[in-house]
């Protein structure tokens, strides 16, 4: 179980330094960091901005659960993640994750596991905007939308 508050969902700009500080400790010989950045294209379509929505309370609880799982499964690691919501432009950071461990391999593995679990389990929704309008990303059918918060865990394929 982590000592520090290590997860958040917020509208303000993200800081790599903040998540690194959350995982820094004397026994850590390596810290791995991942920052997910808004890019200007997705699957061949131009992207001008992203809108992220979340049920913040549920998202934070699930992120906290993921942190606890990883730290329990991979003894000796500490992980932290902050996800941004609201309107983000190209080049903005949407998520920052960090993991510390006694050795670099464990830090890289923990950081990768953290982002993978967040992307597959946390109820945060992404809408891409471009010259042709907007589209929700990752939703297979209309029942899976930000309006259906209770239905975010499903087996429709993409997460």
Listing of model-derived features with the role each one plays in the protein:
Residues 1-94, 100-112, 116-159:
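N-terminal, polar/charged subdomain of small-to-medium soluble alpha/beta proteins
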């Amino acid at each position: 179980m982590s000592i520090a508050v290590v997860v958040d969902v917020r509208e303000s700009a993200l800081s790599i330094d903040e998540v690194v500080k959350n995982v820094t400790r004397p026994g850590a010989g390596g810290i791995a960091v991942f920052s997910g950045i808004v890019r200007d294209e997705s699957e061949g379509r131009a992207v001008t901005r992203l809108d992220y929505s979340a049920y913040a309370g549920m998202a934070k609880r699930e992120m906290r659960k993921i942190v606890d799982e990883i730290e329990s499964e991979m003894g000796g690691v500490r992980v932290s993640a902050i996800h941004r919501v609201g309107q983000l432009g190209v080049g903005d950071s949407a998520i920052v994750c960090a993991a510390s461990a006694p050795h670099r391999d464990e830090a890289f593995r923990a950081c990768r596991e953290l982002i993978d679990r967040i992307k597959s389990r946390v109820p945060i929704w992404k809408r891409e905007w471009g010259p042709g309008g907007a589209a929700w990303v990752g939703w297979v059918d209309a029942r899976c939308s930000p309006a259906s918060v209770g239905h975010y865990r499903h087996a429709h394929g993409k997460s």
